[in-house]
Amino acid sequence: MSGSTGERSFADIITSIRYWIIHSITIPSLFIAGWLFVSTGLAYDVFGSPRPNEYFTETRQGIPLITGRFDSLEQLDEFSRSF
Protein backbone atom coordinates (compact mmCIF):
# COMPACT_ATOMS: atom_id res chain seq x y z
CA MET A 1 0.00 0.00 0.00
CA SER A 2 1.48 3.29 -1.05
CA GLY A 3 1.09 6.59 0.69
CA SER A 4 -0.07 9.87 -0.74
CA THR A 5 2.56 12.42 -1.75
CA GLY A 6 0.03 15.24 -1.83
CA GLU A 7 0.52 15.87 -5.54
CA ARG A 8 -2.32 16.09 -8.02
CA SER A 9 -2.91 13.11 -10.23
CA PHE A 10 -2.12 13.30 -13.92
CA ALA A 11 -5.80 12.90 -14.78
CA ASP A 12 -6.66 15.91 -12.62
CA ILE A 13 -4.00 18.01 -14.32
CA ILE A 14 -4.94 17.28 -17.92
CA THR A 15 -8.66 17.69 -17.30
CA SER A 16 -8.30 21.11 -15.67
CA ILE A 17 -9.22 24.24 -17.58
CA ARG A 18 -6.10 26.07 -16.40
CA TYR A 19 -3.86 23.39 -17.99
CA TRP A 20 -5.52 23.79 -21.38
CA ILE A 21 -5.53 27.61 -21.24
CA ILE A 22 -1.78 27.62 -20.60
CA HIS A 23 -0.92 24.91 -23.11
CA SER A 24 -3.22 26.18 -25.86
CA ILE A 25 -0.93 29.23 -25.94
CA THR A 26 2.50 27.69 -25.30
CA ILE A 27 2.36 24.70 -27.68
CA PRO A 28 1.46 26.72 -30.81
CA SER A 29 3.96 29.41 -29.75
CA LEU A 30 6.77 26.85 -29.63
CA PHE A 31 5.76 25.50 -33.03
CA ILE A 32 5.70 28.98 -34.59
CA ALA A 33 9.04 29.91 -32.98
CA GLY A 34 10.66 26.76 -34.35
CA TRP A 35 9.22 27.35 -37.80
CA LEU A 36 10.53 30.93 -37.83
CA PHE A 37 13.94 29.77 -36.55
CA VAL A 38 14.31 27.42 -39.51
CA SER A 39 12.53 29.40 -42.23
CA THR A 40 14.49 32.62 -41.65
CA GLY A 41 17.80 30.78 -41.91
CA LEU A 42 18.83 31.59 -38.36
CA ALA A 43 19.27 27.88 -37.64
CA TYR A 44 21.94 27.69 -40.36
CA ASP A 45 23.79 30.66 -38.84
CA VAL A 46 23.57 29.43 -35.24
CA PHE A 47 24.74 25.89 -35.94
CA GLY A 48 27.16 26.80 -38.73
CA SER A 49 25.76 24.39 -41.27
CA PRO A 50 25.72 25.39 -44.93
CA ARG A 51 22.47 26.36 -46.56
CA PRO A 52 21.11 23.94 -49.17
CA ASN A 53 22.37 26.09 -52.05
CA GLU A 54 25.89 26.27 -50.54
CA TYR A 55 26.78 22.59 -50.51
CA PHE A 56 28.08 22.65 -54.08
CA THR A 57 29.50 25.84 -55.58
CA GLU A 58 30.17 26.69 -59.22
CA THR A 59 33.83 25.76 -58.89
CA ARG A 60 33.44 22.73 -56.65
CA GLN A 61 30.87 20.21 -57.81
CA GLY A 62 32.46 17.08 -56.34
CA ILE A 63 32.13 15.61 -52.88
CA PRO A 64 35.01 16.69 -50.60
CA LEU A 65 36.50 13.34 -49.61
CA ILE A 66 39.70 12.86 -47.66
CA THR A 67 41.62 10.23 -49.61
CA GLY A 68 45.18 10.43 -48.28
CA ARG A 69 46.13 9.09 -44.90
CA PHE A 70 49.27 11.16 -44.43
CA ASP A 71 48.31 14.37 -46.24
CA SER A 72 44.86 14.76 -44.71
CA LEU A 73 45.63 18.17 -43.18
CA GLU A 74 46.64 19.55 -46.57
CA GLN A 75 43.42 18.21 -48.09
CA LEU A 76 41.36 19.79 -45.30
CA ASP A 77 43.09 23.12 -45.89
CA GLU A 78 42.37 22.83 -49.60
CA PHE A 79 38.70 22.06 -48.97
CA SER A 80 38.31 24.92 -46.49
CA ARG A 81 39.88 27.39 -48.96
CA SER A 82 37.32 26.41 -51.58
CA PHE A 83 34.39 27.53 -49.41
UniProtKB/Swiss-Prot annotation:
HAMAP family: PSII_PsbE
Sites where the protein binds heme: 23
UniProtKB keywords: Chloroplast, Electron transport, Heme, Iron, Membrane, Metal-binding, Photosynthesis, Photosystem II, Plastid, Thylakoid, Transmembrane, Transmembrane helix, Transport
PROSITE patterns xref list: CYTOCHROME_B559
Name of the protein described by the UniProt record: Cytochrome b559 subunit alpha
Cofactors demanded by this protein: heme b
Classification via NCBIfam families: cyt_b559_alpha
UniProt family annotation: Belongs to the PsbE/PsbF family.
Record's function text: This b-type cytochrome is tightly associated with the reaction center of photosystem II (PSII). PSII is a light-driven water:plastoquinone oxidoreductase that uses light energy to abstract electrons from H(2)O, generating O(2) and a proton gradient subsequently used for ATP formation. It consists of a core antenna complex that captures photons, and an electron transfer chain that converts photonic excitation into a charge separation.
GO MF annotations in UniProt: electron transfer activity; heme binding; iron ion binding
Organism: Pisum sativum (Garden pea)
